[in-house]
Amino acid sequence: MSEHERTFVMVKPDGVQRGLIGDIVSRFEDRGLKMVGGKFMQIDQELAEEHYGEHEDKPFFDGLVDFITSGPVFAMVWEGQDATRQVRTMMGETDPAESAPGTIRGDYGLDLGRNVIHGSDHEDEGANEREIELFFDEAELVDWDQIDSSWLYE
């Protein structure tokens, strides 16, 4: 059996402005993932710089910070078997032009800078915990029993 885990996902300002929150949430629910936290918010400069800190020395850092602070986002925590890998697969490639149809970025992404969604990197050990703690207090995460989980997981 695969690992049951939590993962961080964020609908970026372009996805919020285009009214895509509901569709994105539905896709993850349809996949059998369970939302345990959700927050509609405006990211400030300090949080943006901390969130993208790994890219601080890169030429695109200022653009990332400017974009993610340009409008509201919808931050979420999803739970399920291999949740991070499932979410990353459903999101598609970072560049929408390289994303398959049927993925979130393949269907809705416009370009590399406007790719609708962010998800924790499954190859970065600790990325989930770091991002979840950055955006959510423990009290904002809800442990609940999904009634159909016995149908989803062995």
Swiss-Prot record:
Spans through the membrane: none
Top-level taxonomic group: Archaea
SMART domains, per database record: NDK (SM00562)
GO cellular component: a single term: cytoplasm
Span of the signal peptide: none
Keywords: ATP-binding, Cytoplasm, Kinase, Magnesium, Metal-binding, Nucleotide metabolism, Nucleotide-binding, Phosphoprotein, Transferase
Subcellular location: Cytoplasm
Cofactor(s) listed in the protein's UniProt record: Mg(2+)
Pfam entry (one): NDK
GO molecular function: ATP binding; metal ion binding; nucleoside diphosphate kinase activity
E.C. designation(s): 2.7.4.6
EC class: transferase
Chain sites annotated for binding ATP: K12, F60, R88, T94, R105, N115
Active site residues according to the UniProt entry: H118 (pros-phosphohistidine intermediate)
Catalytic activity: a 2'-deoxyribonucleoside 5'-diphosphate + ATP = a 2'-deoxyribonucleoside 5'-triphosphate + ADP; a ribonucleoside 5'-diphosphate + ATP = a ribonucleoside 5'-triphosphate + ADP
GO BP annotations listed: CTP biosynthetic process; GTP biosynthetic process; UTP biosynthetic process
Listed CDD domains: NDPk_I
Family: Belongs to the NDK family.
Reported function: Major role in the synthesis of nucleoside triphosphates other than ATP. The ATP gamma phosphate is transferred to the NDP beta phosphate via a ping-pong mechanism, using a phosphorylated active-site intermediate.
Protein name, per record: Nucleoside diphosphate kinase
